[in-house]
Structure formats: C-alpha cells, structure tokens
Swiss-Prot record:
Gene3D superfamilies: 1.10.1420.10, DNA repair protein MutS, domain I, MutS, connector domain, P-loop containing nucleotide triphosphate hydrolases. It is found in: Nucleus. The keyword NADP does not apply. The lineage of its organism: Eukaryota, Amoebozoa, Evosea, Eumycetozoa, Dictyostelia. Pfam families: MutS_I (PF01624), MutS_II (PF05188), MutS_III (PF05192), MutS_IV (PF05190), MutS_V (PF00488). This is DNA mismatch repair protein Msh6. Heterodimer consisting of msh2-msh6 (MutS alpha). Forms a ternary complex with MutL alpha (mlh1-pms1). Interacts with exo1.
Length: 1260
C-alpha cells in the first residue's frame, strides 16, 4: 500500500450538521501515543490537502495570509490548520480501531467540515486498501493532486527556497496544535491502571461498537451501505451544548482542538500509522485466522508509513513501483510446459517454477497450489468472513462484476462477503465461467489444537487449513438458491465413432440424480443426435478432445445456440473405459451394480460416455454424492412404438419450446400448455410434450381424468390445494439423500408430505367415482401393498409400472425419521443414545453454561446490582458488564476487557479459567453437529425410493391438472378429439380448426378452417395447398400439427369437432434456411429434410411440406417437388399437406386422381395492385400467387413492378406453349390458360395470339 495514493478524507461528508452525539469517555487511549517512534513524526506534504478556499486564493500575498492567521489566532489559543486536513490513520490490523476522542472548537462560527464532538473511527484494513486503490474516481484523485501541487508551489514561492529547503525548515517546526484527550472524571482504580496498556493493545483487535461492522466489498449493491476507507460511527445522541462544531473562517488551514472535561494531557508529537503493503494477504475481519496474518507479515513485510522518514518526502519509489511481476504469469504455460499457442495447451493448468514456489509465503503457496490446478476456473478463496479472488480472477470480478479492485503488482484482489457468495457465483456462472469454492476446514481453536498435537509450529501448520470443496458449473448446480430454472438442467457427455456415425450419450440432472443413457446409430444428417439435443437442451457438454468430429461440434453449437452451453474438451485418458466405469459405480453404490447398467455394459460407446461424465463429476467434487443416489435409465430420443415421434426439426419448425423470432418461449406451445403449479410437474410436462402418447387407451384415460376434474369441483378444489405452494420437493429429497441439505429442508419435506397424506385421506370417498385409472393412482394410496416391500419402481424405464401402483403410504417413514431427532433452541439434537459422543459434548456445554449463569448471580449478589450482565463482543465473550458506580467493590483478579462512559467490562478469574474449556467444547460441538446431521439425513435416505414414487405421482397429478386448465379454462373453443382405431392408413377430419397460440393473441379475428384427409367425404390422404404469398398457408400447416400433438397428449383441441386416428410421427419441412456452420445451402437443407421424410414416413404419419424446391432453379425445383409428391401419393400414402406455388403440380396426370386440392382465398384489386387476404380454405387451385401485388404492398417502386409484370407475362406464356408442345396439357387447357392470361389485355394481342396458334398442331 502506498501512502501517497491515500484518499484525502473530508470528515464532514459522513455527518449531517444537525445530528451530533454526546461525548463519551474511553480510558486507556493515551497509551496509543506513547509507542510512536520519534523518527516517524516528520510531516508528509503530499498528505496535506488544500481546501477549496485556499485553492481559489493562491494568488493572495503572504501578508494577506498572515493577516488571516493573526485574526484567527485571536479567537483561539491554538494554531489553526485546514479543516479538511488528513486525519491520522489507525494502525492497519485485521480488526477495527475506534478513536474515541472528543473534538470541539472554541470558535462560535458553525461549520460543516468537522466531525461531531464525539465520534468513533473504525478502520477496516480491507476496506481501506480497496478505497485507496479505487480507480473508479479519477476526477477526485486528479483534483486532490492539483490541490497538493498548488499548495506546494505556494509554500515554495513564499519561502523563497526549494521544496527540500522548505521541508527541512518545516520539519523543525513542532506542531502547535493543542490536542486534549478525554479522561475519566474519577481517578482510575488500581485494576484499571494496571490494564491501561492492555486496553491499548486490545483496541487494535476489537471494535468497541455495540454492533459488529463488516467490510463492504460489494460497492455496487444498493442494498448495502457503501463504506469509505474510514467509517465514523455515532454512538450517542447529540448534546445541545458541548457537541456544536465551530471553526474560524480563514484561508489558513485549521486543526481541530479537543476540549477535555478534566485536566488534559498534551502530547508533543502526533500519532503515526504504519501500513503493510502486503496487508491484503492477511485475513480480513477474521478472528479465526490471526496466525495467517503473522505468517504473511513475517514472510514479506515491507512497511511504509503515512509520514515519510527524513529525506523521503519526495521522489522515493515505494515497493509497489519496483516489485517485479511473477514470471510464470508473464509467459503462461500449462503444467506440461506448453505455451498458450501450442496445440496441446491445457488451459486448466498452470506451470509454476520451483524457484517461485520457494519465495511464496505459506498463504501464497496454499493459494497457488489450488489455482494452478484450476487455472480456467474462477476461484473464490475463503478468508475469514469473505471470499476473495486473486490475479486473473480478480480481473474478471472487477471487469465483469464491477467489484472494487485492490490493484497490486502481484496478487491483486477483489472480495465479497461470505453471505453473498451465491449471488456473485451465480452471475459468473451465467456469464459462462466455472466457479471454484475454497473453504476453511478448521477454526482458530482447531488450528491451535493441531499445532499442540504436533508439538510445535512450522510454516505449513501456521495457517488455517483450506481445501477446494466444490466447483460450480452451469450444468451441475445443486444449491437451490443458484438454480433459477425450474426445468431440468442437464450435463451431457458424448463419445463418438465418426466412421460408423455412432454416439454414446449420457445425460445427468445432478439436482435429482437421474442419468439417461442411450446409443445412437445415426445417419449422415445426424437427425437423431440433433433431436436428442433439442429434447434435452443441455447447459453443459463434455466431449472427447481430438476424437469428436467437427461436424458434431458444429451441430451442438448450432442447435444449442440459444442455450450457449459450456463446452468442456476432455482428454481421452479422462474417459474411463467400461470396465473401470462399472467397478467405480459398483463401489460407490455399496457393492451393488444397478441392474440397468448390467444390461448396457457391453455397449462400448455408451459406457464410454458414462465414464467421461462420472470422471468429470469427480473432478468437480460432486461425483461421489451424485453417483451414490443415481438412478440410471435408458433413453431413446425416437421412442418408436411407445409415443408419437417429434424429431428435432419438428420441435424447431413448430416452435414447441422456442420461437423463431428471438428464441424465447413467447408464443410457443409449451408456454400455452404449461399450467403446472410445481417445479417437478413442469419438468415432467416438458417430457409429455416431447413424447405425446401413441396408445389409444392411455389417451382416453387422460381424457377421462380431466373430465372428472371438470365435473367434480369439490375434488378439483382439494387436488389444487394439495399442489399449491409446494416447494421443489424432488430436488430437496435429492439433496437430503446426498447429505448436502440443511436440517430445515428435511423438516420442510417431512411436513409437506405429512400434509399431503392428510389431504389425500379426505379424498377416499371419491375413489369409486373416478373412471380414470391414471388419476385414481395419483390420488389414492395402495393399502394392499406392504410399504416395506415396495419395489424400486422409479428405476424402471416404463412409467406405466408406477403409474397404476398407487400413491405410497409415507406416514410410517415420516414418523421414523422424525423420531431420530428433536429441535432444541434452534439446535438439532439427535435422539439420546443415537450419537454418544455428541450427547457427552452437549452435556459438557450445558454444564459449563449453567456454571457461568451461577457465577453471574454470585456477582450480582456481591455488587448488590441487578444490572450486571454478560456482554458478548466479537471474540471476547462473557465479559461481565458492571456500571462504573459499582466498580469500587471490584474484587482482586478482575481484568478489564472494555469500557464506556457508563460501564466497565471484565473477565473474572472464574471466567478466565473456564472460558477456554467452553470454547473448545463448542468447537467440538460444531464438528459433531455436522456428523449428526449426516446421520439424520442418512436415516431419510433409507426411504428415498418411496418418497421418489410419491414425487412421480404428484408430478403426474400436476400435469393432468395442467391439461384440465388448457382444455376448460381457455377462451378458445375446445372439443374432445375422438380417436378411431385404424390398422390401415391414417385419417384426420377437423372442423373449425384454429391455431391456439395465435388465437390467444388475435382472439375472434382468427379465421377457422376445416381439414379432411383420407375420409369418406375426401378420400385422398394428400392435399396440394396453393394460395397467395402471405395468405396463411404456413399457419394452416403448423396448426394442423399442433392439433395432433395436443390431441395425443390427452388434451382437448381448438376446434368444434375432431376425429382422427393415432399418428405415429410428424414430419415437417418448413421455411428456407441455410446452415452455414454445416456448410449446407438452402437447397441442401431442403433435400436433407425431405430425405428423412421419404425414408421414415409410414401410412400413419403426418407429413407437412412447405414450398419444396424453391431453393434452386424453377425447373429443377419443380421436378423435385413433382417427384416427391408422386412418391408420397403412390408409395408411402401417408397423410400429407403439400403447400406449393407450383400450381401445375395439381394437374399432373400421375397424381391428380390421388390428391385433393385446396387454396387460401383472397380478394384482388387489380387497379390498386392490392390483395386482401381472407385466410379461408377453399377447394381448388389458386390461379396465381400474386407475388407482384404483395411486392406493391411492400412498397417496391412502381417502375420495378411494371417491368416485373411484363417479364412475368412473357414467361408464363412461354411456359404454357412449351407445356402444350410437349404434351403435358391439352388443347382446351392451353386455350383456357391463354385466355386467362389475356382476358384483360388488348384485343389486338389476343388476335395476334390466335394467329400464332394456327401455326401450331392444334390437333395434338
């Protein structure tokens, strides 16, 4: 720390002039001046600020200044100095120091620039460092520098000599300021006099304020007061007389005088405060880590003073200016010695030469030992009551979080209070960083014990032990305060065989301990892999460095562009082989291999992905807890046969989860349908949308469930009451099982499940009335099943296994867990005999506390004063507080610990003797309490499977309630879809269909339409849809698919009637987008998506194709569109809506009898060149796309549109003639097309055309 950079503090900024406290008396302050070295008393001109009045009057003559000074001296006997002059700095210690000196002025002129007559000066080392190195106030620093320069030049010119001569003269003049210290009105008693020096020392370790004050690092948090480098704390109410502040109004600097109540002591020298440049390496406000401070200071203490030594007032370079930068941070290399530009550079590690390690202090060695292994991670390092970030991490905290930076050559630092760790860590994680948390593993008492056990102290043992306890990443968050998303948060690990297009994939939601595993045999377009990504939307990805193809990496970045997942490239050796993976999982699962994994052990790439995932979890310190509670499930992104398939392209084109405008959920199907009350219900509902049912009976059962809720309002009210205000029980029980939760979480979980149990009992009378088996299983307990024999059904892949088994009876388990502990005075106490060591420790504490209480009563009797009480102040606890008036009866052996004007506080011999024992027992209690908590939580984990089944039932109940709300609480007309079994071709017949997402915004303005495919009234299963641009074709296509998805989820649909067969899959080819990342053009994307349709579509599929062939030339595009249309109509025979601007496709002879035609109607104003879109579907073919009319409406210049009309007419005429010549249209059709083209043209042109036709073979 450089004193020259100190901020000049104006005392007045901390006080309102109308509120001033009464003076108080603090004893023992005089000794503070006695230890100050004489050689450190020389003034530092750089620290003397210039008041605004001085700055504006620098041109005044010295005689004017002398006159002002003489005038001032007549009003007071003291030499005046500037009211804004530098306040003496307190010694830099980890604790706070208060200077309880009463300042008053004898002048009658009021002022706002001096402090109240009584104030407390609290100096916090870290806050002082931060404030004096604050680069966010350049204007203020510049102004101060200008003031100092002006003052120096003014003094130099008046003295007629150089600055050095001036300094020599100035230092010989002793300050004439009369400083008086408040002393007790009564003589000190003998114990008080004996302990005066002790009090002086204690002032460096204690804060005499009644309320503890912590350093405020968070200077950007508006909820927390932003402390300056000094904090003046008013402790008493203002006095009407003695507290008024006065000063002389002169341009000569004034010095405050201190008016005593008793005879005063005038020191002959002023206090000097020393600063350690490495103080920020010490603990901040840390009563537990004093030894770290000592070690750091011994290792690298270079002390500078606020007042420079002789001859160093100007020009001397301090340590900060000459200190060299760590060499290993100048040329950064990884642990293997590879520089940053090396292809094998590992950004996770840092190479530190042995020569640097030997120069580190124990604390620095401790820090760099952890940081060098996690160099790509922002490390929060616990020091006392704060978490601190150093070096590059400090830069990130300063630049991205705007935290105040303590800038130094090495070990620059920012810090945050420990209570706000989650807040700042969450921000960094949201910005894409990984965050490491380093905690203190012992208290100062524990450290002392450890040192005593080792029989001494060495450098390694001289600091608090710290360990890296966790690494937080976007995909592995466990703390409920940091998980802001109620949907699942996934970490994905993949292992790829590029040659065979095979993937092994592992997804894990660590918040609930679920692993999803699958092997994908994909095609060239990686359609299944893309579908998997869109279904799961992982927040973080682990992939094998050098073994993952660029195409796969490109797909992940493109598909997940809205999520922006954290990408972790891992070395191949960090991917465990299948055998090693199975052995480690078996070991963590108590020697029992999960049955699901036994079935997958021969799938090499799947097990490789699982090994890579668990290896990563181990590295971030959560692998053991997650795997121990894990449930492994096989996952199939295309669950053929069990549910309707919605591939990735379908999820994107239909805007199921994210819209195409800004990537948000606004206007999506999920946003419309998700009415779930609980977080775990929302997670299940997302899976319901991804996998609509493909079983008629299951769909009908859901329909019956929501209809029962509609028809039974009393039951509906009770069901709603069960789910209302439930916390995220699924994640809470997972944390309890992992033993990472608080006892309050366990109590909350037990209370909620007990309340649910009571409410379910109220529904027993309605059991026989519910037709839906699904709803009945969610509401009623399966009393026929012995709860001790409930199978671990949550490990099953088929939800049907648990859907109809009934809600488990949890009452016996709740009572067993509750009996294992009690809560006494906010402390967790295990049942007696469960933890003998804890019982003994608690008994010792209670016995000691009782003896302390008895001792207090004895003191009250001795002093005959009931106001005597214990006072706990920071680390100094059990201080016996005695009013000053009663201290005459003070027994021998009492040691003074602190005092005020009204009371003194002591430690009696009894307290001194027994306090250490009490502190040791309490420290042991804290350690044992953690073990007790783990034991209690482990008792709950025994019954975890039963609670998980209950969560599944509640999730399903919440999803059914959401379907009910969408079906019967929407403003849109809804109907129950009727499903008809059909083993042949699929069909759909819908009346008055609307798009529910658009209708929710447009209301009754939305135009309904009918769709009929493969019905009695409309036998063809393929419809060719034409119409003008912007006529509503794409909307019709999407709403048809949305209706099918809603229907097969068991929900009502937005139509007046709906009859359909089960659809096995929906294919969509919508829009025209290129894929730059994959190197694919618009046409290539079209063909790839169309290829999947032709390859996988069946007679029961619904296919949506929009403007196929527009990505290439007209003739090539038409040819492809015709070929696909022909193949779908003759070979696949699936339900299909084929939207196109190629009207001629409807007349192709090979398909015209196999298709139906429809178009979106409109009204055309030829004169105004405008189109009024009617958005109503009609049978037939639209004669024109009216693209030029739309162009006119869009504002294109008239000249361009006229030219386009001429060219369009000629091209259309040529196209018709060519088609006639090649025999693709008949003579009558040719004439019809020509007449349509010329019906509003000049008659001469029509005659000219007739002559042309005569020359052709019209008999063709």
């Amino acid at each position: 720390m450089k004193p020259n950079n100190m901020k000049q503090t104006n005392i007045s900024q901390f006080f309102a002039p109308t509120k001033q406290p009464e003076p108080i008396i603090e004893e023992g302050f005089d000794s503070f001046f006695d230890d100050i070295p004489t050689e450190e008393l020389e003034p530092d001109l750089n620290s003397i600020p210039i008041s605004s009045s001085q700055q504006t009057s620098t041109s005044n003559t010295s005689s004017q200044q002398t006159s002002s000074a003489n005038t001032s001296s007549s009003a007071t006997t003291t030499t005046t100095t500037n009211t804004n002059s530098q306040i003496p700095k307190a010694p830099t210690t980890p604790s706070k120091l208060k200077l309880p000196t009463s300042f008053t002025s004898k002048s009658n002129t009021p002022t706002k620039s001096l402090p109240p007559s009584n104030f407390s000066l609290v100096v916090n080392e870290q806050e002082e460092e931060n404030e004096m190195n604050d680069n966010s106030k350049p204007q203020q620093q510049q102004q101060q520098q200008q003031q100092q320069n002006l003052f120096k030049s003014n003094i130099t010119s008046n003295s007629g000599g150089s600055s050095n001569d001036l300094f020599s003269r100035f230092k010989d003049e002793k300050p004439k300021t009369t400083t008086t210290l408040s002393t007790p009105s009564k003589p000190l008693s003998q114990p008080q006099r004996n302990n005066t020096n002790e009090i002086s020392k204690k002032r460096k370790e204690m804060d005499f304020n009644e309320d503890e004050s912590n350093t405020n690092y968070d200077n950007n948090n508006n909820d927390v007061e932003d402390l300056d480098e000094f904090c003046f704390v008013n402790k008493n109410k203002p006095s009407s007389s003695s507290s008024s502040l006065n000063t002389n109004t002169t341009t000569t600097p004034k010095a405050p005088t201190i008016t005593p109540k008793t005879p005063t002591k005038t020191p002959t020298r002023r206090p000097v405060v020393t600063y350690d440049e490495d103080d920020d390496d010490d603990e901040q406000d840390d009563d537990e880590d004093d030894d770290d401070d000592d070690d750091d200071k011994k290792s690298k203490s270079t002390t500078t003073t606020a007042v420079k030594k002789k001859g160093n007032a100007f020009g001397k370079k301090d340590k900060k200016e000459i200190e060299e930068r760590y060499s290993f941070l100048v040329n950064i290399k990884d642990a293997n010695g590879n520089p940053k530009d090396h292809p094998d550079y590992d950004k996770r590690t840092l190479h530190i030469p042995a020569s640097c390690l030997s120069k580190f202090s124990p604390f620095e060695r401790q820090f760099w030992d952890i940081k060098s292994k996690n160099y790509d991670t922002v490390v929060f390092f616990k020091k006392g009551k704060f978490y601190e970030l150093y070096e590059s991490d400090a830069d990130i905290g300063h630049q991205q979080l705007h935290l105040k930076l303590t800038d130094r050559v090495n070990m620059r630092m920012v810090g945050v209070p420990e209570m706000s760790f989650n807040h700042w860590a969450s921000k960094l994680i949201h910005l894409g960083h990984k965050v490491a948390k380093v905690d203190q593993m012992e208290t100062s008492i524990g450290m002392a014990k450890r040192q005593n056990e080792k029989g001494g102290r060495n450098k390694k043992d001289s600091i608090i032990q710290r360990e890296l306890t966790s690494i937080l990443t976007a995909g592995t968050l466990l703390d409920e305060q940091m998980i802001t998303d109620q949907t699942s948060t996934y970490l994905m690990a993949i292992k790829e065989n590029e040659y065979d297009k095979q993937y092994g994939v592992c997804f894990v939601d660590v918040s609930i301990g679920e692993f999803y595993l699958c092997t994908i045999q994909d095609d060239d377009n990686r359609m299944q892999f893309e579908t998997l990504l869109l279904q799961m939307m992982p927040k973080e990805i682990v992939y094998e460095k050098g073994a993952t193809s660029p195409k796969t990496i490109s797909i992940m970045k493109r598909v997940l562009s809205t999520v922006k997942p954290v990408m972790n490239a891992r070395l191949s050796l960090e991917y465990w082989d299948p055998t090693d993976t199975m052995e480690r999982i078996t070991q963590l699962c108590g020697g029992k291999t999960p049955e699901t994994l036994c079935q997958m052990k021969n799938e090499e790439y799947l097990m490789g992905a699982l090994g890579g995932c668990i290896s990563y979890l181990m590295d971030i310190k959560i692998g053991n807890s997650v795997v121990e509670q894990a449930r492994f499930k096989r996952f199939n992104p295309l669950d053929i046969g069990n549910s309707m398939i919605l591939d990735g392209q379908c999820l994107v084109n239909l805007e199921i989860f994210n819209n195409s405008t800004d990537g948000s959920t606004e206007g999506t199907l999920f946003k419309l349908m998700d009415r779930c009350t609980t977080a775990f219900g929302k997670r299940m509902f997302r899976q319901w949308i991804c996998r609509p049912l493909a079983n008629k009976n299951a769909i009908v059962d859901r329909q019956k469930a929501i209809e029962f809720l509609r028809d039974s309002p009393e039951t509906l009210q009770k069901v709603t009451a069960i789910l209302n205000k439930l916390p995220d029980l699924e994640r809470m029980i997972a944390r309890i099982r992992a033993q990472t939760s608080k006892i309050s979480d366990l109590i909350s979980v037990l209370n909620h499940f007990d309340n649910i149990h009571s409410k379910l009992l109220e529904l027993l009378d309605e059991a026989e009335q519910i037709e839906s088996i699904h709803l009945r299983s969610c509401l009623f307990m399966d009393n026929q099943q012995d709860n001790d024999d409930i199978d671990e059904q949550e490990n099953s892949n088929n939800n049907n296994n648990i859907r109809y088994s009934g809600y488990p009876n949890l009452k016996p388990y709740i009572e067993r867990v509750r009996k294992s502990f009690t809560i006494e005075q906010d402390r967790v106490v295990p049942s007696k005999g469960l933890f003998l060591e804890f019982d003994q420790c608690l008994g010792n504490i209670q016995s000691l506390e009782q003896s302390f209480a008895k001792h207090l009563e004895e003191q009250k009797a001795h002093f005959k004063c009931n106001k005597i009480e214990y006072k706990h102040m920071g680390k100094e606890i059990y201080q016996i507080e005695i009013p000053v008036a009663f201290t005459k009866k003070l027994p021998a052996g009492f040691s003074l610990k602190s005092s005020s004007s009204k009371v003194n506080r002591y430690h009696s011999p009894f307290v001194t003797k027994n306090l250490t024992s009490l502190l040791e027992e309490r420290d042991t209690y804290e350690v044992l309490s953690k073990e007790v908590l783990k034991k209690i939580l482990s008792n709950f984990a025994i019954y975890f499977n039963h609670f998980q089944i209950a969560i599944t039932k509640l999730s399903q109940l919440d999803c059914l309630l959401s379907l009910y709300k969408v079906s019967f609480q929407s403003s849109i007309q809804m109907c129950r879809p009727l499903f008809v079994s059909s083993d042949q071709r699929g069909f759909i017949d819908v009346k008055d269909m609307r798009h529910p997402c658009i209708y929710s915004k447009s209301g009754d303005d939305f135009i309904p339409n009918d769709i009929s495919l493969n019905t009695e009234n409309n036998p063809p299963s393929l419809m060719v849809l034409t119409g003008p641009n912007m006529g509503g074709k794409s909307t019709l296509l999407r709403q048809s698919c949305i209706l099918v998805i809603m229907a097969q989820m068991g929900c009502y649909v937005s139509a007046s009637s709906c009859e359909m067969s089960i659809v096995d899959r929906i294919f969509t080819r919508l829009g025209a987008n290129d894929n730059i990342l994959a190197g694919q053009s618009t046409f290539m994307v079209e063909l790839a998506e169309t290829s999947a349709v032709l390859k996988y579509a069946t007679k029961r599929s619904l296919v949506i194709l929009d403007e196929l062939g527009r990505g290439t030339s007209t003739f090539d595009g038409y040819s492809i569109a015709y070929s696909v249309l022909n193949y779908l109509a003759t070979k696949v025979q699936s339900m299909c809506i084929f939207a196109t601007h190629y009207q001629s496709l409807a007349y192709e002879p090979t398909v015209r009898d196999l298709i139906s035609t429809a178009y979106m109607t409109c009204h055309v104003d030829e004169e105004a060149k405008k189109v009024i879109f009617l958005y109503k579907l009609a049978s037939g073919v639209c004669p024109n796309s009216y693209g030029l009319h739309v162009a006119s409406m869009a504002g294109l210049p008239r000249e361009i549109i006229t030219k386009a009309e001429e060219k369009s007419t000629q091209m259309e005429k040529d196209s018709v003639l060519v088609s006639f010549i090649h025999g693709t249209i008949s003579r009558s059709k040719l004439v019809e097309k020509i007449v349509q083209s010329y019906k509003q043209k000049d008659l001469n042109q029509l005659i000219q055309l007739s002559n042309t036709l005569k020359d052709l073979n019209l008999n063709k």
